[in-house]
Amino acid sequence: MNDAFSTAQHRLDALGLRCPEPVMMVRKTVRQMAAGETLLIIADDPATTRDIPSFCEFMDHTLIASETTQTPYQYLIKKGL
């Protein structure tokens, strides 16, 4: 596991879920976080490779790291203001 992923303050397991469920769960989890906190998302839906980066851009969160070369995919996001 990438060192960046091991520093996450929150973790969300979205394995087995299909669009739009992973992004809906990310949104719900991020709402409960403070600005600046980080979330590790583990997913296996190929749609997340497009949806998670788009979600971050649209909602002003930062996609710190992603690993999408093999499943499970991993995403580390930092909550914006």
UniProtKB/Swiss-Prot annotation:
Q: Where can this protein be found?
A: Cytoplasm
Cellular component (GO) terms are:
cytoplasm
Q: Where is the active site?
A: 19 (cysteine persulfide intermediate)
> Sorted alphabetically, which keywords does the UniProt record give?
Cytoplasm
Record bears the keyword Cytoplasm: yes
Task: List the GO biological process terms.
Answer: tRNA wobble position uridine thiolation
Write down the InterPro entries for this protein, in alphabetical order. Answer: Sulphur_carrier_TusA, TusA-like, TusA-like_sf
Sequence similarity: Belongs to the sulfur carrier protein TusA family.
Q: What is its biological role?
A: Sulfur carrier protein which probably makes part of a sulfur-relay system.
Q: What is this protein called?
A: Sulfur carrier protein TusA
What organism is this sequence from?
Shewanella baltica (strain OS155 / ATCC BAA-1091)
